[in-house]
Amino acid sequence: MKLRRMRVAAAIAMAIVSAAGFDLSLLNDDDILRGGTVHAPQEEEERAFGASLSHSSSGSDSFSASGSAPSFSASGSGISLSTSGSAVSLSGSDPEASFSTSGSDASGNDGSLSASGSDFSFSMSGSTPSFSASSFDASSSASGSELDFSASGSAETSTTSSAGSDATTTTSGSGGLLAPFATEEPPETLFPRNALGEMAPIINVAKGLLGKPLPTNKWWGNLIHTTAEELNTKANPGWSNPYAVKLPKEAPYGIQACYSYNYRQLSALTDGVAEFYLHDFVNDITLSATEFAGEAKPIYEMYSFSDFGIKVRACLENKQQCMDSALVHGMAFITATYDRLTASIESEYTMKIVDKSVPGKYIIDLGGNQTWVVYTGNDGSFTIDESGKALVSSKPFTGTVRVAILPSSEATDVYDKYRTCHVRGGNVSVTSRTEYLLQWETVGKSCKTHGLLHFALPHHLPVLKGAITAKNPKAIVLNSATRGKMVAQVTTTGAWTLSEAENDLEVDFYPTTKPSAKMVSKLGLLKTLQADIADDWGLNKTSWYFNGKQYQKYASLCLMAADVAIVGKNKKLLNTCLSKLETLLEPFLDNTLAPPLNYETSYGGLVSSQGFTANDVDADFGNSVYNDHHYHYGYWVTASAMLKSLHPKWKRMKELDAMIWIMLRDVANPSSEDAFFPKFRHFSFYLGHSYSHGVTPMADGKDEESTSEDVNFYYGMKLWGQVSNNKAVEDLGSLMLRLNARAIRTYFLMTSDNTIHPKEFVPNHVTGIFFDNKAAYATWFSAEKYAIHGIQMIPVSPINAMVRTTEFIQQEWDDILSKEPIVTEANTTNAWLSLLLVNEAAVDQADALPKLKKATMDDGLTRSWALYNAAARSHSAKSQQPRRA
C-alpha cells in the first residue's frame, strides 16, 4: 500500500513538472524563505537512493506518459489521475489519500493541485511544485531500492542509483536561458581525440560516471584528482564552507571534516600588513566506522554530482556495508547515513560528552576549545571509547549521523529544529537575465514544515530575497575560510531566489562615453591607429593564451577603425584591418594553429594538445589539464564577437561560428543535455566567480588569479550572443557577468572598508592568488607588486569599469601603485606600466595620458587601444556599475 501510494505520488509529480516554465519565488515569513522546488524527504535514519522517473509495474498500478505536452495517466486500486493539455482530473478512493485541484492550467501559472496520503504529499500552486514522500526499503540489504524524486524550476531531473559500483546518473534539461548551446559531438576530423590517463589520474569515482563529462574545476575536485606519485598515499581536502572535508587515505577513514577558521594563520607582518593567510586542516570530526580498520579500508566512490556538490559513499569490499554522504556548498551539517556499520565519530582531540540528556543527541567538547553537536537518531546508544577520542555506537547501526560545530550555546536550539532536513545537492535555475535560483535537493521529514538550514556567503545577502542577516539575534553565523562570514538561511522550499539588477553602465564593444573629437585630435589617435594596423601581426606564440591575447588586441583595432569619431566616413582603414585579421585567423578555423586543439575524453573538453606532445601538465599554463580555459578562450570569444559585429557576412563566418560555439560549450555549457561537455566548467553560481585550476590536486584547493580575464570571458559570451542574435546566450552571459562582477568586488578587490579578509591583509587591496583555503598577495609568475595588481587589469576593456570602481582605483593608486618605482622613476621600458596608466586614467587622466603616449605597451595592448580607453574614463566617472550587461 505504501509503495503504491508513493509511486502514484511520484507519477503525479512527474506529470506536473513535465509542464514548462515554473515561476519560483521566495517570501520572507518569520525568517523562513518560501519559494518553489520539489523535495524528496525521507526519515533521517533511512538511506536515499534514487529511482528513475520512468516507471512501469505489473499488478494494480499502471502509469503512462508520452511526449512533451502535459498528457499523463495513472491508475491503481483506488487512485486515478489523468491530464490532457491543460486539464487535470484526479480521483481517489484510497482512504488514506486525498486529492484536490483548482484552476485549469496544470502547466501554467494559475492552477493549483494538491495530493496527500499517509506516506506522501504533493502540492502545486501556480507553477510551484512541492513533493514529499516517506522512503521505503525494498529489502534488508544495501542493494535495495528507494524512491527519490526531485525536480525544480523548469528542469526535469531523474536520478537512479544503487549500492556497489553503480553510479547515479542525473539528467536535467531546461529550456530558455539554460538551453544547451549545441549537443552534437565535436567532429573528430577537426579535433583529434586524446585522454589524460596517467597524466592526471581520476580516483574515487564510480565506474558508471567514467567516460562521461565530469566537472573539472569544482570545489570538490581534490577529492577525485591526484597524481601518479600521490595515487595511494595522499588525500587533499575540499572546502564546501563553512567546513573543509576530506576522504582520508589513512585512519580514521570516512568523511573527515574541519572547521577551517579555527586554524587560521597569518604570515609575518611587514609594516602591519600580511602577505598571505591560510588555514591548517585538522581532523576535528571524522564520520567513520569501527569496521574501517586495518586492512579493511573503505572504498570511496563519488556516484553523483550536481552544480554545487557531490554524493559519495564509503563501503567495505563486500559493498553491502556502506556509509553514504552528500557534500554540498554551504551545508550546515556534515551528514552520513550508515547501513549495518558500527558508527564511530572520531577526532584528533580528546572528547568529553557535555550533554546527552536528549535521546539521540550528544553535545561534545573537543580538546577543551570547541564544542560540536552530534545527532544520531533514536536507534542505539553511543559512548566514548577507551581512546577517549571516539564516540561509538553500541552495535551495528543503520541510520543517519549529523554533526555541526556550535558557535554558541544558543545555536543548539536552532540546530535541533532543522536537524532532520538534509541537503543532498543543488543546481542553478535561471528565470531571466536578472534573476536566478539556487535550488537545493533536500531529504528529510521536516523540510517542508521547519525547512532546510543552509549557509549563505556575503555576496548573496544583498540580493537574496528574504535573507536572514547577521543582525538577526537568532542567526547562526560561521566563518568561511577565505570568503568571510556565512549566515545560515532557512527555506521550506529548498530554493533561494537571487537577483542581479541591470546596472548603470551600458555594456557594449565601446566605452560608454567615447573620446570626444577634440580628444581624438589632441592624442593623435588616427595616426597612432594607422601605425598599429600597419604593424606586423602574428599568431605564432604556440600558446592558446598568448595567441588569444594577440587576437583580441588586433580585433580591438578594427573596432577603433569603425569609430567615425576617429576615421570619419572613410572605410578604407577598417577594410584593411578586417582583411588582415581574417587572413591571420584562417589557421584557427581548421585547427591547424599551433598547438592544435584536441577533444579530451576522460573529462570531456577542448584542450591544447601541447600537454600531450610534451607530456607536461604545465604546458600552455596547464590548458591540457583544464587550467585557465576561461582565460584562454575568453580572448577568442570576445575578439570573434568584435569581428562578427564588424563583418557578419565574412565568407568564413560559419566556420568561425563553429569554433566559437565549441569554446563556449567547453567553458560555459549550461545544460546536461550536452553529452560532450560538463555544465559550467569554471563558473560557480554559488560562489559567483570562476575557478581557474583544473584536474591536478592543490593543497589549498581551487584558485582564481586574474579576475579581469575571468570577466573578459563572460563579457565575450554576452557580446557573442548579441551579435549572433541569440537572446538566451546574451542574457545568460549578461547575468553571469554581473554576478561575477559582484563577487569580484566582494572578495578579490578590497577597498579599505573590506570586512571579508583579515584587517592585516586588506591594505594589499587585491587578493593576488585567491584559493579556497588561502589568499596570497602574489602571482604564479612574479612577486612584483605591479604584476600582482596588473594581472587584475588585463585585457584593457570597457567592461573593466563594471568591476574596478573609481573608489577602489583611487585607493589602490594612492596606497600602493603610485609609490612603486615603475611609476616614480619614469620607467617607460617596463610594459606593465602601460596597464597601470590606463587604470590611473580613471582617477587622474591628466597625469596618465601624456605618460601613456610614451610607455612601452603590454604584449596584449596597442597604444591606440590604451589611449582610447584611457581617454574614455575620467575622474568624473563615479563608481560605475553597468546598467545593461
Residue ranges of predicted features:
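Polybasic, positively charged surfaces/segments
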Residues: 713
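Inter-helical turn/loop segments and adjacent helix faces that build the functional surface
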Residues: 561-568, 643-655, 717-731
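N-terminal, immediately post-signal peptide pro-regions of secreted/luminal proteins
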Residues: 22-108, 112-134, 141-154
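Cleavable N-terminal signal peptides of Sec/SRP-targeted secreted and luminal proteins
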Residues: 5-21
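Ser/Thr/Asn(+Pro)-rich, low-complexity disordered segments
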Residues: 20-39, 44-45, 50-53, 153-155, ...
